[in-house]
Design a protein with these regions (language model features):
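Hydrophobic helix-and-loop "lid/oligomerization" segment in the mid-to-C-terminal part
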Residues: 1-229, 256, 295
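Mid-to-C-terminal polyanion-binding domains and interfaces
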Residues: 99-151, 155, 183-185, 203-370
Length: 370
């Protein structure tokens, strides 16, 4: 749903107000994930009366419903369906939680919330196993405009679309994950990548003689092909002029010494509106001096710039910390703007998405050997 449509936006805004969330299971998910939904990236503003933002919903509610539909057993699906009905959600049933006492009872909705989490964790483990398998094949096909992976049962058919989506986002090109059928053809899921100018990978795929059918949306569909290698070569020819270089689309470019904190705060306050068609703003910061580097708990990197805007990266590797601590030069970084609220104080922050290091040019004295 495109949030640039005023009608769509209004329907979403009405639906995400607390008084309109009547579904017991959905409301339970908002309570269970209240901490995550309140983080700076997802928290609603005070302007529109939202209880949950569209992005918060898409990250912490929708994936659990998606997981039960894709990876749940029929018994698990039936339980969660009952938890969506007011007339059944609050009925008492025998508890199945770990360590429960003999005859212990709990509400249908409480058991369903726990089941959703368990199924999502199960799906995530399967997804990570599939991604690990496919990552090993990437070096052999990195020069192709489209990745086509032929897999067996080692990648669960129910999550092939999710795996394709993750690979598409990482490598910024269309991805297909297919398996061989009994008739010798290959069927599976595809995901397109629109930011290189391919508005409908479905239409592009249908031009290949190796394509039997594509069914679904423009950039998220099922497909059937005769030969993965031939299909990939057809796509290479069709998309010959499309770049596969990793790109970042940014809204502002600042030198680190001239960051405008008011712009950072304004962009960070756009959470209510982010979603399909309205991406999170990104900012490119040049010439960040590493002299201000501070390594905090959990390998959190903090860089303090002249106007008082902190640039952060959480969960850096030990290798990153070592390199940044000893590097002689500056950093250029693509960042997302957030606002940090603590004890009533609001400060602008920039969270690093990706970065490059630029070595300092040796001064004339160093060049002369002094």
């Amino acid at each position: 749903m495109d949030l640039r449509s005023l009608e769509t936006k209004e329907l979403i805004f009405k639906g995400l107000q607390e008084e309109h969330i009547k579904n017991p299971l959905i409301y339970g998910l908002t309570q269970k994930n209240a901490f995550a939904l309140g983080k700076a990236d997802y928290a609603p503003s005070d302007r529109n009366g939202l209880f949950v933002t569209p992005m918060g919903c898409s990250f912490f509610i929708v994936p659990l419903i998606n997981a039960i539909c894709r990876s749940g057993t029929m018994e698990e699906k039936a339980l969660c369906f009952d938890a969506m009905l007011t007339m059944k959600a609050f009925n008492m049933i025998l508890s199945n939680k770990r360590g429960h006492k003999q005859g212990e009872m709990e509400r249908v909705v409480d058991q369903a919330l726990r089941t959703l989490t368990n199924v999502k964790n199960r799906q995530t483990r399967a997804e990570e196993a599939g991604l690990t398998l496919l990552e090993k094949r990437v070096p052999a096909m990195i020069d192709n405009k489209v990745f086509v992976f032929s897999v067996g049962e080692e990648v669960d058919p129910n999550i092939r679309g999710l795996v394709a989506n993750k690979m598409m986002a990482k490598y910024q090109r269309p991805v297909c994950v297919v398996s061989k059928l009994s008739d010798g053809t290959y069927a599976g899921s595809m995901r397109g990548f629109t930011k290189t100018g391919i508005e409908s990978f479905k239409e592009v795929a249908e031009t290949s003689p190796a394509c039997i059918w594509v069914r679904g949306h423009d950039n998220a569909a099922g497909l059937c092909i005769t030969d993965p290698e031939q299909f990939m070569q057809d796509m290479n020819a069709k998309l010959a002029n499309i770049s596969t270089e990793i790109l970042y689309y940014v809204d502002y470019v600042f030198n680190a010494a001239n960051i405008n904190p008011n712009i950072i705060l304004s962009l960070a306050d756009a959470n209510d509106y982010l979603g399909t068609g309205f991406d999170r703003p990104q900012i490119y910061i040049e010439e960040i001096e590493l002299d201000s580097l501070t390594i905090m708990k959990g390998n959190t990197i903090k860089l303090s710039t002249f106007p008082g805007t902190e640039i952060m990266k959480f969960g850096a590797t030990d290798e990153e910390v070592e390199k940044l601590s000893t590097f002689k030069g500056t950093m250029n970084a693509v960042c997302k703007p957030v606002k940090n609220e603590w004890c009533g104080n609001v400060k602008p922050q920039l969270m690093i998405i990706d970065y490059e290091l630029v070595k300092s040019e040796p001064g004339i004295m160093a060049a002369w050997g002094f």
